[in-house]
């Protein structure tokens, strides 16, 4: 028996003296057994390396070498080796999924006994967190009895920790009881192995070699203690400057953990009278001279010892700054590829580290794939994110939430459940996807939520009824109906029977059987195997293993349901939660697909030291040192208190280090990463965060290294520069190099500089490449592409619009906002997907229909609105709304009955309409204007409607404008009739001369023009001859909320009228204005109108306005003529094929703000050819002057013609 330590820094070669000792032992005692123990993470690589090194020392001349007396194991593999035939090893191995399930069941069973954990079981991640805590107790040799003793010793003031330990003790005790004799987990095996080796195995001819450990858990330490006591020899390699048999160094020193382990093992040997041989120093350097200098510096920098003199600027240590993580990973992958291309390296010579891989997970794969660099990413992949697990969760959610749209389509979009045809074959995926997309559109458009829609006997009927269909059901509609009903029937025939069987499952075993039979019979396993085969065909072996592993985990979980919960009565919510808890603890096991590949890993875990070059990415102040401490159930202060009490009970028990101790170990963890490569070390970091909102700082560790060695920071450019000759960072595979060539060529074009000779050489190579030549020409040709729409040909215009445009004025307003958007929407008829929702248009329709119905009802009953009492008014308003909300007559308002939320909105809409009815009544009492007609249509073919506005625009082409006027008011003054327009709006509107001039707000003027053109129809001949337009105003339909300050000192009704005033454009005619507000007819009145915002009567009796509200007859004619000119100009441009990409910009508003076509237009203001059409600010005088000048110029042009 003996204990031997081999000591040295991480830059020294520990492996060679270890293998030398092993070779001597094998040669001297060929029948003895030797075991080389390393952390599980590096077992495979170490086995290959150790056996290769052993061959060189024992049989260098042999072509083949085998050694049965030497085994390379991890601790868990050592347990398998010795105990594989023992009864304990034959017990069912409980998986992490089953562990979560068992803990969940224990919490539910003991809920009445628990205090603070009782309500935590449904919190995401809690069960896994609790499983981790119990595993920590196991590894730390802490029993439930130890927790009880600790509780008794705790200070009574620490009630929170007492409550936690109380619950943990109950759960842990139940857990140990449930596990005993039924299951075994990996954390149990080491204890069993220690007992087994101590009691049943003769280790006198066994030799153990430990490498790669800096600290051991209580379980591992107990096991190693048995090995020291009973084996022939134990040799331990440690990263340590010298031995520490008595006094430990300070906790902040670099090698504290290794020194502590040295002392623990030394004391075990001393206590058992096992000879401790003289420490052997690892004297041979494993790393290059530059890395040796870094090793020396880093050791000295962690102590108060003098700093060593700086060496010459090292060439094998490098720091690279990249613009972002994408550029950073691209630089790493490119450099690896280039170094392998030299012939001096293999891919396996590279190790890429970062502290947290999740920050790089989305960019590593596409970049390394693009650079054709084989790699193995050893980051854990959660099984809970697999589509099969999502399918299982969605299935239960469909049942629990009554076939909610999102849940049903989560099931269907998993593509694991597919309909079968008459021959039993699964539906082809492309056809299924098309049918599913159509079904989703149909469901969204019609708001089909709930089981009854999916399980009804009657088929769904699809009807598009778009413009031009004439309401006729087409063959295409029938085909779509067949597709969507195939999906509906599939849901009906598949899900309800499953839910019915699950509902009557008496026990958890029954429920597990029902679930298994359902997914098996539905062809889910077939689909998973199809995915596996597709991944194998694509060469993605990592992804290929996931379907089988997920299915195997699913089967194991169901087996554990039977074993753990068995005959307990089924509680379906718990069944789903247990299933989720099971998968929450499962991870995919990953196996390298080839020996020659780059390893990508995290710097916080031990790495094999057989690499030549290490890249450390993400070397920022946020992660080096790392400040992310895993969240556990026990806070640091709890951990310290409990550890102290446990040490009093049994000094062989301890917990994981607290946050302060972990942070103190950061220099050592990073030191191991620095020394992991033998030749070079390359740091890199992104200058910007992922969201590009904040800058990232270089790690203080790397900054110290930089300053000490006088290193400069290399900048990894995001894009190449056209004239640069040093283009190596941008040269990788042909495809990735082509991407950078395009970027360089674009830079050359923008800055008008020639491409460098290096880029021209690359250009020539790619153009003549048989595979990429055509693509090179095509992509470089894109540089001459300009994002400018091509004017439409006359034939296309005729096919799209014919020779007559029938339009509304709002559509022409859209043309003036952005001609190209008009073409997309009304030329190509591109539409967004219909969604069952209460749109502003639907709300407006309800408002308009209610007020129109109220006015007609009042007129039909020959009543005077102003004379109605409140009860009559409310009854009549409610009568109108009741008819409107009858969904058999008006299905467009069915959405207001679709949910409780919509029911609330319906009540709010009705309140608004009751208030507006009251407003209209009060307004009618205060003005002589009276509604003449409501919902006056022009150009829509209504018998009572008015003629459309029609204009010839040359070449036998015509534009016809149609519309609907909400309300037409009239007042008779001195034998003259004035007609005015009221337009109802659900939001605040004001008349803008500027917007009217630019064609952005033509509605009111167009409606006035329609009234003017149709005066003979609206009035009898004598009256029409002298009639004038009164103007056009907006009325905001609302139920206003008044502030206290607004109603103090005046009648509340007056305040309400002020909040609901008309505003718009009025004719500046004293006779008219006097009759607009009865207050103005009062001789002594001076002040503002209650009805029309901005209108006031002065003390002299003159009626004026602020905001340029009033226009005279000539100005109104100018505005109407200009509007007609805008209509004809827009029509002419449309017929001429003008589809300019010219969105307006007015102060902080643009035509693109709410456009659904941005992805189609690809408008980029940074491009020279893409420019906003800026609209200069104009006031009324500016507008009138411009219109007058334009009319004068037009008249001059016509005269000259």
Swiss-Prot record:
One Gene Ontology MF term: ATP binding
The record's function comment reads: The heterodimer acts as both an ATP-dependent DNA helicase and an ATP-dependent, dual-direction single-stranded exonuclease. Recognizes the chi site generating a DNA molecule suitable for the initiation of homologous recombination. This subunit has 5' -> 3' nuclease activity but not helicase activity.
Leftover remarks: Despite having helicase-like domains, this subunit does not have helicase activity.
Lineage, top-rank taxon, reads Bacteria
Q: Which GO terms describe its biological process?
A: double-strand break repair via homologous recombination
EC no.? Answer: 3.1.-.-
Family from the record: Belongs to the helicase family. AddB/RexB type 2 subfamily.
Keyword list (alphabetical) reads: ATP-binding, DNA damage, DNA repair, DNA-binding, Exonuclease, Helicase, Hydrolase, Nuclease, Nucleotide-binding
Name the UniProt record assigns to this protein = ATP-dependent helicase/deoxyribonuclease subunit B
- Which residues form each disulfide bond in the chain? none
The reply on keyword Transmembrane is no
Q: Which cofactor does the UniProt annotation name?
A: Mg(2+)
Outline the subunit composition: Heterodimer of AddA and RexB.
């Amino acid at each position: 028996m003996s204990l031997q330590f081999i000591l040295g820094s991480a830059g020294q070669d520990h492996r060679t003296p270890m293998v030398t000792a092993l070779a001597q032992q094998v040669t001297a005692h060929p029948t003895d057994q030797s075991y080389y123990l390393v952390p599980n993470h590096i077992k495979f690589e170490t086995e290959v390396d150790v056996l290769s090194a052993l061959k060189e020392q024992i049989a260098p001349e042999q072509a083949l070498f085998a050694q049965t007396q030497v085994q390379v194991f991890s601790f868990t593999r050592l347990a398998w080796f010795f105990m594989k035939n023992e009864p304990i090893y034959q017990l069912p191995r409980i998986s992490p999924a089953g562990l979560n399930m068992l803990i969940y069941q224990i919490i539910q069973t003991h809920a009445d006994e628990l205090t603070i954990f009782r309500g935590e079981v449904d919190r995401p991640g809690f069960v896994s967190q609790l499983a981790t805590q119990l595993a920590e107790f196991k590894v730390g040799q802490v029993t439930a009895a130890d927790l009880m003793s600790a509780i008794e010793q705790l200070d009574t003031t620490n009630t929170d920790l007492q409550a936690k330990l109380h619950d943990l003790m109950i759960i842990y005790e139940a857990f140990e009881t449930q596990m005993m004799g039924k299951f075994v987990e990996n954390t149990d095996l080491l204890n069993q192995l220690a007992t087994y080796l101590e009691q049943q195995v003769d280790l006198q001819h066994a030799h153990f070699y430990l490498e790669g450990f800096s600290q051991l858990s209580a379980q591992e330490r107990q096991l190693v203690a048995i090995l020291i006591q009973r084996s022939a020899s134990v040799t331990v390699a440690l990263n340590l400057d010298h031995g520490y048999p008595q006094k430990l160094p300070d906790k902040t020193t670099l090698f504290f953990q290794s020194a502590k382990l040295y002392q623990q093992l030394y004391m075990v040997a001393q206590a058992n009278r096992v000879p401790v041989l003289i420490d052997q120093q690892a004297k041979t350097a494993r790393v290059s001279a530059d890395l040796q200098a870094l090793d020396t510096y880093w050791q000295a920098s962690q102590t108060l010892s003098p700093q060593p003199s700086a060496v010459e600027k090292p060439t094998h240590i490098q720091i690279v700054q990249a613009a972002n993580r994408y550029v950073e990973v691209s630089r790493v992958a490119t450099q690896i590829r280039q170094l392998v291309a030299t012939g001096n390296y293999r891919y396996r010579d590279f190790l890429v580290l970062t502290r947290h891989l999740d920050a790089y997970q989305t960019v590593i794969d596409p970049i390394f794939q693009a650079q054709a660099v084989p790699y193995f990413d050893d980051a854990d992949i959660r099984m809970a994110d697999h589509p099969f697990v999502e399918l299982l969760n969605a299935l239960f959610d469909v049942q629990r939430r009554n076939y909610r749209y999102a849940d049903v389509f989560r099931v269907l979009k998993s593509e694991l459940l597919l309909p079968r045809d008459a021959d039993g074959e699964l539906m082809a995926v492309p056809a299924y996807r098309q049918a599913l997309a159509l079904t989703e559109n149909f469901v969204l458009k019609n708001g089909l939520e709930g089981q009854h829609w999916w399980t009804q006997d009657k088929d769904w009927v699809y009807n598009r009824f778009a413009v031009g269909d004439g309401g006729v059901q087409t063959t295409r509609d029938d085909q779509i109906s067949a597709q969507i009903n195939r999906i509906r029937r599939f849901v009906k025939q598949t899900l309800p029977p499953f839910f019915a069987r699950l509902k009557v499952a008496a026990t958890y075993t029954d429920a597990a059987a029902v679930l298994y039979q359902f997914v098996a019979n539905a062809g889910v396993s077939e689909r998973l195997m199809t995915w596996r085969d597709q991944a194998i065909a694509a060469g993605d072996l990592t992804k290929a293993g996931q379907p089988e592993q997920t299915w195997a985990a699913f089967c194991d979980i169901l087996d554990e349901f039977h074993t753990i919960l068995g005959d307990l009565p089924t509680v379906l919510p718990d069944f789903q939660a247990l299933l989720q808890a099971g998968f929450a603890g499962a991870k995919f096991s990953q196996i390298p697909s080839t020996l020659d590949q780059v390893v990508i890993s995290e710097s916080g875990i031990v790495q094999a030291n057989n690499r030549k070059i290490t890249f450390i990415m993400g070397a920022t102040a946020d992660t080096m040192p790392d400040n992310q401490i895993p969240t556990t159930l026990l806070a640091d202060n709890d951990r310290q208190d409990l550890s102290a009490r446990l040490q009093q009970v049994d000094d062989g028990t301890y917990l994981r280090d607290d946050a302060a101790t972990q942070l103190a170990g950061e220099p050592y963890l990073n030191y191991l990463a620095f020394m992991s490569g033998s030749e070079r070390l390359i740091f890199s970091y992104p200058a910007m965060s992922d969201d590009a909102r904040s800058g990232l700082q270089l790690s203080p560790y790397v900054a110290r290294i930089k300053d000490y060695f006088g290193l400069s920071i290399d900048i990894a450019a995001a894009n190449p520069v056209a004239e640069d000759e040093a283009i190596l960072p941008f040269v990788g595979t042909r495809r990735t190099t082509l991407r950078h060539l395009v970027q360089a060529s674009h830079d050359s074009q923008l800055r008008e500089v020639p491409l460098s000779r290096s880029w021209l050489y690359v250009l020539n190579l790619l153009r003549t490449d048989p595979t990429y030549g055509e693509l090179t020409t095509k992509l470089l040709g894109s540089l001459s592409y300009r994002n400018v729409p091509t004017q439409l040909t006359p034939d296309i215009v005729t096919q799209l619009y014919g020779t007559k445009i029938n339009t509304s004025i709002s559509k022409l307003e859209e043309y003036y906002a952005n001609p190209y958007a008009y073409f997309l929407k009304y030329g190509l008829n591109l539409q967004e997907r219909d969604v069952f929702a209460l749109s502003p248009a639907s709300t407006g329709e309800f408002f308009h229909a209610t007020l129109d119905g109220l006015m007609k009802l009042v007129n039909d009953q020959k009543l005077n609105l102003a004379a109605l009492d409140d009860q009559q008014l409310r009854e009549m308003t409610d009568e109108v709304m009741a008819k409107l909300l009858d969904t058999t007559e008006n299905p467009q308002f069915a959405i207001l009955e679709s949910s409780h939320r919509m029911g609330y909105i319906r009540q709010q809409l009705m309140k608004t309409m009751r208030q507006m009815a009251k407003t209209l009544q009060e307004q009618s009492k205060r003005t002589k204007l009276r509604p003449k007609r409501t919902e006056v249509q022009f150009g829509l073919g209504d018998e009572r409607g008015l003629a459309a506005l029609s204009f010839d625009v040359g070449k036998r082409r015509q534009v016809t404008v149609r519309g609907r006027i909400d309300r037409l008011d009239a007042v008779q003054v001195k034998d003259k009739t004035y007609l005015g327009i009221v337009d109802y709006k659900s939001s605040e509107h004001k008349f803008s001369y500027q917007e009217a001039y630019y064609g952005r707000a033509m509605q009111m003027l167009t409606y006035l023009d329609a009234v003017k053109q149709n005066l003979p129809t609206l009035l009898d001949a004598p009256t029409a001859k002298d009639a004038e337009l009164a103007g056009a105003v907006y009325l905001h339909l609302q139920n206003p909320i008044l502030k206290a300050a607004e109603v103090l000192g005046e009648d509340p009704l007056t305040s309400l009228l002020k909040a609901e005033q008309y505003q718009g454009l009025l004719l500046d005619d004293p006779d008219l204005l006097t009759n607009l507000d009865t207050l103005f007819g009062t001789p002594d009145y001076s002040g503002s109108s209650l009805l029309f915002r901005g209108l006031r009567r002065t003390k002299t009796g003159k009626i004026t306005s602020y905001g340029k509200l009033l226009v005279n007859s000539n100005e109104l004619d100018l505005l109407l003529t200009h509007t007609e000119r805008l209509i004809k100009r827009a029509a002419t441009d449309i017929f001429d094929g003008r589809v300019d990409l010219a969105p307006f910009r007015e102060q902080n508003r643009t035509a693109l703000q709410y456009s659904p076509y941005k992805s189609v237009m690809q408008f980029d203001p940074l491009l020279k050819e893409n420019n906003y059409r800026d609209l200069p600010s104009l006031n009324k005088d500016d507008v009138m002057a411009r219109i007058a000048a334009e009319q004068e110029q037009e008249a001059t042009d016509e005269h000259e013609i």
